Amino acid sequence: MYDKNLGTKQKALKINLDRRIYGSFAEIGAGQETAAYFFKAGGASGTVAKTMSAYDMTFSDAIYGIEEGGRYVVESRLMKMLNREYNLVEKRLSEKRGTESQFFAFANTVVALNFQKTNESHGWIGLQFQLTPGGPTNYVVIHVRMRDNENLLQQQALGIIGVNLMYGCFYYYKSPETLLLSLMDDLTTERIEIDMVRFSGPDFVKVDNRLMSLRLVKNGFTDAALFGSDGGVLQPSEALYKKHILMMRGRLRPITNVHIDLISNGQRQFLAEPDVDESKVVLISELTLHNLKAGDRVIDEKDFLDRVDILCSLGHMVMISNHHEYFRLMAYLSRLTKLKVGLLLGSPSLQDIFEEKHYEFLPGGILESFATLFSRKVKLFIYPTLQADGSVYSCENFVVPDHLRPLFQYLVVNDKIEDIRNFNKEHMHITTDSVLDKIKRGEPGWDKLVPENVAQIIKEKLLFGLPAENNYLDTVKQIHQAVGNL
């Protein structure tokens, strides 16, 4: 049963007094505090087989090997630490106490605030552990960003979250949602951010890490989570390090032919930019929490997974974020990469960006937001809209209040905003809402408005409210065609 009021020292003491839990701690870099909590709690001999701190890089390399790229605070280093330390525990202690102990290896690799306070403070923390003596091993791995302004406070927070991770893995493992929630016990998001979590192992086969990542954002533990095109969870700053990001935001329920036209033409223009290296470009489809919420303002988790599956099938990375305003999104992306970023937008979204009411809470208003949105390495690519009279609405005839027109013209002239060219006018009548309505009614022809493989997935899984009888009739038609071809 989850007890939010259970303190860090009490958690460490309970683990120490549990005679089944036994293993080792390995902490390199700035994360030296987790094992200390267990010693200070008392009874540490019941839990701690070994603690190790490899602070010097040469010592660390001698023990765990050299990482590709020479970086130390990366997931691959953490996994080497966990596997090596756990294997040593099993090798040296299995004969003596393997039938009565649940072995574990705890590890972290962390860079904390430097003396000048100029660096990014973050770290990888993980636990490899058994839930039964002699049983299989599981992993829970998290990535954190530290927000305290003092090195000592960062170390304290790392120790707390390390204890929380261990306690959660051993006592809340039956409810991964509770385990996730408990990671922030005795902490606040002002002190630490968890931007990635991954559960793996035989005891977590039913855990969908994409849902766990969604809950990180829902719970406010982070502002964004990222999935690869294979559907696996990624740590954003590691996955997007030294990458050009090309991003499209939308509800994408479902993704339609007009989205594909926007992406293909927008990507072509982005790759033509002189300061863009094609080999470093990643395409991301972004879903905001706001766009995931249904009419009752509750997120339908199955619908979320369906959208992610479809986007991944197209080879896209997928980001779920709580950055409703574009300038906040760009502030976040600029923290992940120093290379050029492109945003793919429809002209209605550009119209919304120029609405001053969105920035009334900022002291500098729209100018303050634009200073972030249109930073040195950002460019917006705008997909035109088909108007009721059949004309095309683009940057060339963009309507903006008179007092903002010089600002708009400045951005166009200085290559911050550009129309997407060579668009397919035949697709421009397609809207997500109209396609969704056709799907829900089972109206013939909806499948011609979305990519072929997307239509196939929707039919196979009856997504987005597609009536079952519609799928049945389609299947019967295919059978008749097949028989007729015999």
Predicted stretch roles:
Residues 1-486:
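Nucleotidyltransferase catalytic core that binds NTPs
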